[in-house]
Amino acid sequence: MRWLAGFAWLVAAGALAFVAETKVSQLPPEARDTLTLIKAGGPYRYPQDGKTFHNREKVLPKRERGYYREFTVKTPGARDRGARRIVAGRGGEFYYTEDHYNTFRRIRE
């Protein structure tokens, strides 16, 4: 029973987050293009790309400031950056959101 209390504490502290997963092949083509650019180190389409993602929504696992970076996924027909992003962690993990950080899916290769 102690392990359950410890597990609950980790979840409450944000150290563990439950995020759905998706395969690269299931992403929209624009997200796959953005992922390719991230892995190549750019060039990026928007000046905000590569900036720190602060995880204020606490949807992703809690990490130190600067751990996550965000990148815009082009939204066809949008006049601005739209709501779609890929967030990259320093550990090599990638997350996709299509609703401006409300939900994420971890991208699996």
Q: Which role fits each region the language model picked out?
A:
Residues 8-13, 27-30, 71:
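Generic signature of intrinsically disordered, low-complexity, basic-rich segments
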Residues 3, 18, 22-24, 101, ...:
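Extended, aromatic/histidine-rich regions of cofactor-dependent oxidoreductases associated
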Residues 17-61:
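N-terminal secretory signal peptides
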Residues 1-19:
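Core subunits and conserved enzymes of cellular information-processing
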Residues 42-109:
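Functional cores of ribonucleases/endoribonucleases
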